[in-house]
Regions:
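Envelope-exposed proteins and targeting segments
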Residues: 22, 54-56, 76, 95-97, ...
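Amphipathic, non-transmembrane alpha-helical segments in extracytoplasmic/periplasmic proteins
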Residues: 56-59, 121, 130-160, 175-202, ...
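A mature extracytoplasmic/lumenal domain signature
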Residues: 62, 84, 123-125, 205, ...
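Glycine-centered loop/turn motifs
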Residues: 73-81, 225-227, 236, 379
Length: 453
């Protein structure tokens, strides 16, 4: 891999896929440093709101006997700096991160004079996680407990943390001999906002180790708008070309998986929570009945049609079938004294709505490929604009409202090869179009005519 991509004017990028591999330094076990920029053929870095650490795969073509010279053994440090200068503003954007090799895999000698292998890398706190287990008493909000684990056990500096500590209820618990990241996952299973939204613990390449709720995501501003357009209208090298390709969706695909059958079975729209208090031997038979309401939607319309004549749901509206999904929770109201909440207590009030968030967050999912963006990260909101398949026949209204709208960036695969590209998984928990507003063509009765081509 050359240190620069070919699409540069001086040090400025002609396209959003341009970048400069400015630094890639490997520190061996004995402290010796090696500049390995010239040996790299590809870098792939993955981040996700479901992953506690970013990870990287660095593909090496070794023609200088690095493996023996550095005595590679699988715990080396790699300091990475990738940057780009914008063509019009001359502002410099960058990704800078310190990784630690977790595995060296895929060794091969396919030609004389060189060998290939792959460094799999993780962040420092993921490495630290493997060195200890926790079996401590903790109290406070779950968010504050998680923040404490990050700073004291995972040794993450405060400046590299962004933790929402305002989780529902102060609790007391004993962590049952878990590694720090497993303890955070265990605690997070009972972490909610005051209105029942779930939390996510994750790391991004651009930012910090973060702990945020779905409400935090939904309340944030849209950071970019991307357009799925079949043609480019500007000339390469111009400012207009850079701007146009920056917001263009190059590929869009989806497994779709739209299913009210599965969602209703998961309690996405209605459920009942039943609890037993083992201290007082009382059972809440009536339960906490939840019907879909109060969920913060990314777009304006619910993820289900509002109708009453649902034969498949026993003639009930889909958001009223609360007996179809039941959650059973054991609590101990006297574990730490009167009016002291133990670990399970927040779930009694919040489990139904939390599951509604979790079951509807991927109501509609797309995988898109876009040009490299140094400022896009998981947990942000974007808008996409998708043209109708018959856009040329609908010039007055060419936008597909069902596919367009606000989406949450759930994961990003940063790929640095000939160009910098992003493969982004985006999700929305709602629609940009009313599902009750079914279009009817002239000359049909209560249905839409479909013309086969």
């Amino acid at each position: 891999m050359t240190r620069n991509t070919s699409r540069l004017i001086g040090t400025a990028g002609v396209t959003p896929g341009s970048y400069i591999l400015s630094e890639c330094t490997l520190t061996a076990s004995d402290g010796a440093e090696f500049d390995i920029k010239a040996l790299i053929t590809q870098i792939v870095i993955t981040e996700s709101i479901y992953s506690a650490s970013i990870d990287a795969e660095i593909i090496i073509m070794d023609g200088v006997n690095l493996f023996e010279s550095a005595k590679l053994n699988g715990d080396e440090k790699i300091e990475l700096l990738i940057k780009r200068q914008e063509l019009d503003t001359k502002n410099t954007e960058k990704h800078q991160h310190t990784f630690y090799i977790s595995e060296i895999i895929a060794f091969a000698r396919k030609r004389n004079g060189s060998s290939t292998y792959v460094f799999r890398c993780v962040s420092k706190h993921a490495y630290v996680n493997n060195t200890k287990t926790l079996d401590q008493f903790k109290e406070g909000t779950i968010g504050s407990i998680i923040k404490g684990i990050c700073t004291s056990d995972l040794r993450i500096p405060l400046k590299e943390l962004d933790v929402n500590t305002s989780t529902y209820k102060n609790i007391k618990c004993i962590i049952p001999k878990l590694r720090p990241l497993a303890a955070i996952k265990w605690l997070n299973s009972n972490a909610f906002t005051t209105t029942g939204a779930p939390f996510y613990f994750y790391e991004t390449l651009k930012g910090k180790v973060q702990y945020k709720s779905y409400e935090d995501f939904a309340d944030s501003d849209v950071v970019a708008t991307y357009i799925h357009s079949p043609v480019l209208i500007s000339t390469i090298g111009s400012k207009e070309y850079y701007a146009e390709t920056s917001r263009r969706i190059n590929k869009l695909s989806s497994d779709l998986n739209l299913s009210k059958y599965i969602a209703s079975g998961e309690g996405a729209y209605a459920s009942t929570t039943r609890s037993i208090d083992i201290a007082t031997k009382t059972y809440d038979v009536k339960g906490q009945q939840y019907n879909y309401k109060g969920v913060k939607k990314l777009n304006g319309y619910d993820p289900f049609p509002k109708r009453n004549n649902n034969d498949q749901y026993g003639g009930q509206p889909i958001d009223k079938i609360a007996s179809g999904k039941n959650y059973f929770i054991s609590s101990n109201s006297l574990a730490y004294g009167d009016k002291q909440f133990n670990f399970q207590d927040p779930s009694i009030d919040s489990m139904g709505k939390c599951q509604a968030y979790l079951s509807t967050e991927d109501t509609i999912v797309h995988d898109i490929v876009i040009a490299g963006n140094f400022n896009l990260e998981s947990g942000q909101l974007i808008k996409i604009q998708v043209n109708k398949t018959s856009a040329f026949d609908n010039e007055s209204d060419p936008i597909d409202k069902m596919q367009s709208g606000k989406y949450l960036v759930a994961s990003i695969i940063h790929k640095f090869a000939d160009e910098y590209t992003l493969q982004v998984e985006i999700k929305s928990n709602s629609f940009n179009s009313d599902l009750n507003d079914v279009l009817t063509l002239e000359g049909t009765k209560g249905s839409t005519e479909v013309i086969e081509t």
